[in-house]
Amino acid sequence: MTQLHFDNRLRQQLPGYQEEGARRREVRAAWSAVMPTPVAAPYLIAHSAEMAHVLGLDASEVASAAFAQVFGGNALYPGMQPWAVNYGGHQFGHWAGQLGDGRAISLGEAIGIDGGRYELQLKGAGPTPYSRGADGRAVLRSSIREFLCSESMHHLGVPTTRALSLVGTGDAVVRDMFYDGRPQREPGAIVCRVAPSFIRFGNFELPSARGDNALLRQWVDFTIARDFPELVGTAEALYADWFAQVCQRTAVMVAHWMRVGFVHGVMNTDNMSILGLTIDYGPYGWVDDYDPDWTPNTTDAQGRRYRFGTQPQVAYWNLGRLAQAMAPLFADQAPLQQGLNRFRDTYLACDRRDTAAKLGLAECRDEDLELIDALRALMRDAEMDMTLTFRGLIDLSPVHPDPAQLHDAFYDDHKRVASASQLQEWLQRYAARLQQDALSPDERRALMRLANPRYVLRNYLAQQAIDQAEQGDPSGVQELLEVMRRPYDDQSGRAAFAARRPEWARDRAGCSMLSCSS
């Protein structure tokens, strides 16, 4: 039998409801006990070998029928004590009240072989007290996307939750994918998400909004003690240091999003991790042809609140809501503003660091920010692929910069021809800057290869894997996972995974924009 050691501190140290299964309109506690709802025939589709290793699970254990039973929601390992957490949140800028884990059930906090804490959470394992009438299930397509993106982001170096397993349930789930009144039966699945903590901004917002300062303080004290043990101090000074840390980590996370071209799609405060991890992979996407106004979320198509270019500002706004929630614990609000200033300072520093790395420079001067902004404007106007453009600059000659290096980045030949002189002018500016820089050509290329991925999880690649899996063939999911394990390497025989979005995928559902239906 698999031996995992569990230390379920959240359930032990925060107030909750011990009785299982009861649905409540309003919950005045941190968590509720709940059991996963069994499924018909759980089977393993894919898993992360790295994550399994950290947890001390070997290949034979992962391949066992018992593993599929546990991570399909039909059984528990010793020490597991399932629960769902209560939280609120601001959604699309408006307070939404109590939300909670509507279809996420935490099995326990496992201690890995590295001594780290890893909360194991099933997404799609049935209803919880916070499901608000929903079935608590998830479909295969959204589960594949979450599984692949969790691991892809990790290997890109982006702070993120992880994924241990993707399990098919053998049951159908009814969903209206486009919210057009035409629901369909789809195959069900369950992802086991993994993180040191799944605590969100909304865990603090809800008790604060209700005036429950005692529970608010319990949440803060618990989070600092368990997840920020390096922080020391008392009372407001400790809380201020903690809030500044949250702001700093959030800035680092969002800067990485902007570096690799990731668009989260639903940056509600209930989808913001207190650890600065990317969490809740729904209608996300990667920027193909560069457009700062692009969002992959059909729900946000009108207002585009969560579009690519505004993600740093939205993160700052969300932190403002967290500061607002924390205000009852402070006699003086100045430390909260100082924390918000930490976000701005950290983000600007990360942006300069990433600008230098993406362009292959030893340092980022003020004029380099203008240089990269000019490139972004060119990419937008000429419909150039963001990933391919930056990757194409790696082998550019500083002596004779050749625009042909970037031909594959264009989506429209007419725009390529029309922008030729503008591109040549920019390349000359860039080449001149490289000749002034302290890095050798080899150092420059090495730096750029670590900042500019060759492979990203483009929506059309994920959709192709989904199409295969829905026909009973999981090999596409497994191969895509393998490719995304080495996103910065040139992988032999896998050029197709680095290609720009094909024309057939420009407007296809799942390849361009997605709904929140999952």
Curated annotation (Swiss-Prot):
Catalyzed reaction equations: L-seryl-[protein] + ATP = 3-O-(5'-adenylyl)-L-seryl-[protein] + diphosphate; L-threonyl-[protein] + ATP = 3-O-(5'-adenylyl)-L-threonyl-[protein] + diphosphate; L-tyrosyl-[protein] + ATP = O-(5'-adenylyl)-L-tyrosyl-[protein] + diphosphate; L-histidyl-[protein] + UTP = N(tele)-(5'-uridylyl)-L-histidyl-[protein] + diphosphate
Active site: D270 (proton acceptor)
InterPro entries xrefs: SelO
Pfam families for this protein: SelO
Keyword annotations: ATP-binding, Magnesium, Manganese, Metal-binding, Nucleotide-binding, Nucleotidyltransferase, Transferase
List of residues binding Mg(2+): N271, D280
GO molecular function (one): AMPylase activity
Positions annotated to bind ATP: G100, G102, R103, K123, D135, G136, R193, R200, D280
Cofactor annotation: Mg(2+); Mn(2+)
EC number: 2.7.7.-, 2.7.7.108
Family named by the database record: Belongs to the SELO family.
Functional summary from the UniProt entry: Nucleotidyltransferase involved in the post-translational modification of proteins. It can catalyze the addition of adenosine monophosphate (AMP) or uridine monophosphate (UMP) to a protein, resulting in modifications known as AMPylation and UMPylation.
Name the record gives this protein: Protein nucleotidyltransferase YdiU
Gene: ydiU
